[in-house]
Amino acid sequence: MKTLRESLLLFPLILCADLSYQDRAEKLFHDLEVVREIDQAINKQLPYLFTDFGMVGYFTMPSARMPKAGRFGFGFAKAPPYDIWSLSAQLFDHLETVGSYSIYRGILEWNFGHLGFGDDADRSASAKLGLLRREDGFPYLPNFSLGWIDFLGSKRFNSFFVAATQEFIWADVEATLGWGCGRIKGFYGGLAWSPWNWLTFAAEYDANNYKKHSWEHPLGRKVRSRINVGAQARLWNLFTVSVHSLRGEKVATSASIHYDLGKTEGLFPKVYDPPVYQTEPAGRLRTHEELAQELAVAFKEQGFDLYSAYLTPQGKGLDSLWLKVINVRYREEDTVRTRIEHLLAYQIPDTISHVTAVVEADGVPVHEYRFRLVDLMRYRNGILSNAEFQVIAPLHNASSSPSSYESAHLYQRRRPICIFTFRPRLLTFFGSSTGKFKAQTGFTLSAEGYPFDLCYYFIQGSFTLFSQIQNLRSVDILNPSRIINVRTDGLLYHQAHSFHLDQAYLQRSWHLGQGWFTRIAAGYFETAYGGVAAETLLYPVHSHWAIGFEGAVVWKRNYYGLGFTNKIRKITPNGLTHVPFTGFQYFVDFYYDYKPLNLDFRFRVGQFLARDKGIRLEGGRTFLSGLRLGLWWTFTNAKDMINNHRYYDKGISLTMPLDLFMNQSSRTRIGTSLAAWLRDCGARAYTGKELYQTIFWERYNQHPLFY
């Protein structure tokens, strides 16, 4: 009876508590919904519109807006009387860059259009600098930018502009007011409405000075209306198509693709990457040799190769273990570290007090990890976090293997003697007098390895299947190079035979200690040159800088066969001649890596291949995806003239991880480079695998604990 009475008394309390719990739960979900709505309001943005030449704007006029860093685009526009190809890259949140190629339809190029080049064309580079963006935390202020259109080369469409764009998120509307000088003359404006995220209607006031601009196409000068109206549609948040009126005379269309290559994790998930190691440790009863074999198998499963293992007595029944490991799969140092930490934490028995793991790449001991067993156990048990473990056990400069008199050599594996690689090859040639674009396709077959573990060798041959370059001239008709032709005769090598031995060289590298590295190389370094080279580099662990010294003696290869020549081509006012030549190039290299923005710089000072002296400036940014976009500009004392202006070698480069297109991780990188002109000033011969590039990419960490 008493129990029933107590239950009846407790029932109201339980009921009230339950109702209170439900109220709190409902309030929690309500608060979470409010937070979600606030986040959506903060992150909501209007769709981006792109001009015919590839810059964020409307149809012909740029706006002040720009996407986040890492977004790349490629497009084509038919804007009568022009056909425009464009390539855009958002290097930083506040810097948009665009390269475009405009074809004057119906206007024959006046110098060599009749030779096959066809219609006149112009290359241009444009940039926009964002001074104030809505994403900077000023949602009620307009975006404000200034920009330069076609600021390099012949500058046929050159303009400077300033623009302010206000976004009315609540109404899905944006409005722009801008002013420009050059081809854009005076004030302009734009208005866009996006009733749906995939469709935008827009109108603009076109301020281009079509009538009086000197480089304007004759068929593009007539203007009936300066109001251009049209629409842009986005498909799958990837493709953009646009239709709009132009000058009140024509209808222009464009199509482009835009993708965030900077942050992508790849087209496929890395389903074939093994999980981090979590297996029972080797016990005390196993012999040391069995331990080494277990480690070799475990490292292999994780994507590493174990090449050496030494055991050194430390006293009191404890030993230290020294390992040499080669990373064959992963492209970021923190991934390598995490997997090695897990493997050692689960595999090392309690009879070993310390473990040293040296990581080697391309025959160079790059750095090492030093772990105490007590720290590995604490990490395994979740007492130490990744960040804490990095503080306790940071990277160190690589050490040499222990003495055989003091240590037991448990395991040794030789590097592979021969690895074959088959790849397709595409060579492109732009701006030939007989055509705007020419190509040569084929394949390459290469072999590389470490015979007897003494040095590295690389041999590559190429075979041409299809070529459009057999009738191309190797001399610029309008602007022939007046210095020795160290590069401008390169076309002749590809016209020689269907099969060619591109490279065949030996290289040996050493780590001298305390962050000093050196290498020597000899052989056929590239299609055009062979010789001997040496390099020394100071690049300590945890350093943002490095300094290197390099030099090479190279000889010119014959256009046919494997022989060399001591003559090189030179074009003089009296005609073509050949002069004695032995190539000497030497440089002092300064490197700097700015971690907060993943920027890297190189300043190369010395003598280049054409005996010109000067400096080559290089810079690049690596995005979260591993894609790197770089620029270079060379200033030397060579007097190379193009269109009566002194030319300095410059261009862009692009490299990216191959695993962006794979379902497993890979260290391999692919890339290309494009110079503004193929000239001889600021040229250098390839001399083998550079030390800095090998070490930089092996130590590369997208999210370092310390800057």
Regions found by a protein language model. Name each.
Residues 10-18:
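Hydrophobic h-region of N-terminal signal peptides that target proteins for export
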Residues 19-42, 213-215, 232-311, 317, ...:
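Flexible, glycine-rich linker and terminal segments associated
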Residues 18-152, 168-170, 195-199, 204, ...:
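Transmembrane beta-barrel domains of Gram-negative outer membranes and organellar outer membranes
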Residues 2-10, 545:
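Sec-dependent signal peptide recognition
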Residues 64-69, 132-142, 169-173, 198, ...:
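Short loop/turn motifs that connect adjacent beta-strands in outer-membrane beta-barrel proteins
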Residues 73-75, 86, 96-98, 126, ...:
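Residue-level detector of the transmembrane beta-barrel scaffold of outer-membrane proteins
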